[in-house]
Amino acid sequence: MRKILLFIAACVLPFALFAGENAPKTEENIFELPISKMPPEYFKYEVAFFKEIEIDCNFAFLLGGKLEEKEDARGIYYEFSGGDELAQTMMLCKDGKKKRRVYYELTQILPGVSPIKIITPQGVGAEIRVYERVKTIEPKKLKRKNK
């Protein structure tokens, strides 16, 4: 019985080690939101994802992307997954290629609960854009005549 278990362990161990090497690498991004005396509904927090890519002068963005809310023992976090499919304009460029940020088309508004934890694939960055409500614009009410 012991020999059978050792044989099974010897057969399974290389596959377990091989699977660990091919697991996708991720980065954890933790954002501490600024403290304010204003109520939380005065702010919107938008998350945007990007990659640093060698690209010419054309406008470009990455297609797709998916943001999932998950929960573990440490609390709520978000997990982003996105592809490498690039969309861009097709104009002629004089300059060569330069390394610059290319954003995914996906952006999403998140609740203002600090800290915000986002897991991204290796090489994908995340940033939080903070929007503040400056004033509320009321609509003009026009009286219409019924015909």
What are these regions (language model features)?
Residues 110-147:
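C-terminal partner/receptor-binding element of secreted or periplasmic proteins
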Residues 4-13:
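Sec-dependent N-terminal signal peptides
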Residues 20, 109-110:
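Aromatic- and glycine-enriched beta-alpha-beta binding-site module
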Residues 18-60:
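N-terminal export/targeting and maturation segments
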Residues 28-30, 75, 113-115:
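Intrinsic-disorder/low-complexity, polar/charged segments enriched in Ser/Thr/Lys/Arg/Asp/Glu/Gln
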Residues 44-108:
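Mature extracytoplasmic domains of secretory-pathway proteins
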